Amino acid sequence: MKKLTNYLMKVGMCLLGSVAFVACGDDDPDDGPAVEGLTVTPTSLSFTKDGGEKSISARAGQNVTASSDAAWCVVTIGEKTPTLKVTPINVTVEANTTTEQRTATITVKAGAESKTVSVTQEKGETKPDSNPDPSGNIKYDAKQVAKLMYPGWNLGNTMEAGSNTNSWKSVGVSTETAWQKTTTTKELINFIKAQGFKSVRIPCAWVMGHITDTNNCTIDPQWMARVKEIVSYCVDADLYVVLNQHWDGGWLEHDGFTANAAVALKKQQLTKIWTQIAEAFKDYDDHVIFAGLNEPGVGGAYQDNGKNIADDKLASRLAEYEQAFIDAVRATGGNNEYRVLVVQGPETNIDKTVKNNYCSKLNDKHTGRLMMEVHFYDPYQFTAMAKDESWGKMWYYWGKGNTGSDANRNANSNYTENYVKNQMAKLKTAFVDNGIPVIIGEFGANQRFAIGQDPIHDASIKAWYAAVTSYAINNGCIPYAWDTNSGNGMSIIDRSNIKVLNTNMMTGVTEGVAAAKWPY
């Protein structure tokens, strides 16, 4: 009897196993109504930068499988509810340590049917506040940060404004509106971010109107506070900032390149100025980048005989000043130890900068932390020429298909799209390919007529901005559009009313970015 009982129990267990096996089969004929097709809810998931777990429900009459196309997004199948034919799918997302928003696609299948679920996770970099943590560090080298910075916009004619008659004096913070009428606000900077710009270049005067002690080159603390306030507007908006020492009355950019320049004294003064700036921004993270000068040697590079100083001598003189800038910043330590710094080529002229292998003249204690700066306003007859001259006329029309009836107003074909492309390619070969990103610190062209007055001119402006933007980005250069807030000329944004003023320029930049591809 005991043997028979054991035998019947074994048979019963086998039958139960058979039933369980069938219940997991493709047809699933167990309890509950038949289910047609495959239904998946929700069809999208979003995660914070910290990641976490969420679930998806898949209802189908057949077995469900799921897969993810991203390693950071993992899916696991739960136990199916027999009566409802619902299979839970657990989605686990890792913390995002990158600086970009990322996406993944989950594919859910049941038999021949499949559905997809989109997964989005916010970027991992948290928004810095106006008073960054002093213990913060610099996460990116020059190459890494460069691809996060394009396109760029200039807060032009603002913090660099004033009069050279006030050099080595202190005249207060009112100079911000000396050349244009609008005080910079947080709302303006947020609007700049909304237009798609990722970084802001802040041209800045220090010597010209903001020195309280000439011997020590002491910067007016009120001026420094105002500069920090604007920089913080940008950092709060997750915009990168390039802060420079601009023309600044020409005390260095002109006077430092004359035949009789007191080079040693100029280097001492530059060191004192940049030491103060570096100390003031020491705790800011890598959203803040320093640029030593602006257009060094422009208008001041003359020998005693009245001829332009030879390019190699200009580059060597400039290297002395730039080295003083680099050493001053690094000596302040903290985040400045590894902060990315921007040095300028001779006159920020592309050909002169490439020709002299300029960066080989500089020494930084850390590799991969320098960028090169040049400016681009070519061809001059189209971008900036203010009146016809005996040697040539102003060009109103530029680019493929933009030809006017007056041949004298059409740009020479040697200076259209291919010229821009080739100039940017020179920078890639000389610098970017050798680990030194480039910023086109300024580029711009004057809108000569009211928008709508001359459609071919409108198309030319848009084409030029698009070409410079796209060819720069394609070659690893960050383009910064020059903007003066003057209502005409090179003005993109109406800062008083916080709106786009010149749609030709803005559209050109936007289309240029869309057409471009960063080279690495």
Where are the predicted features?
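Substrate-binding cleft of secreted/luminal carbohydrate-active enzymes
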Residues: 411-498
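Bacterial Sec-dependent N-terminal signal peptides
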Residues: 14-44, 111-135
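Acidic/histidine-rich helix-loop elements
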Residues: 156-184, 212-219, 261-262, 381-419
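A short beta-strand micro-motif common to beta-rich folds, especially ectodomain repeats
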Residues: 99-112
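Surface-exposed binding patches on compact interaction domains or structured appendages
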Residues: 37-38, 59-90
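Active-site region of glycoside hydrolase catalytic domains
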Residues: 264, 268-414, 425-445, 474-475
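N-terminal carbohydrate-binding accessory modules
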Residues: 126-199
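An active-site-proximal structural segment forming one wall of the substrate-binding cleft
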Residues: 179-200, 210, 215-247, 251-292, ...
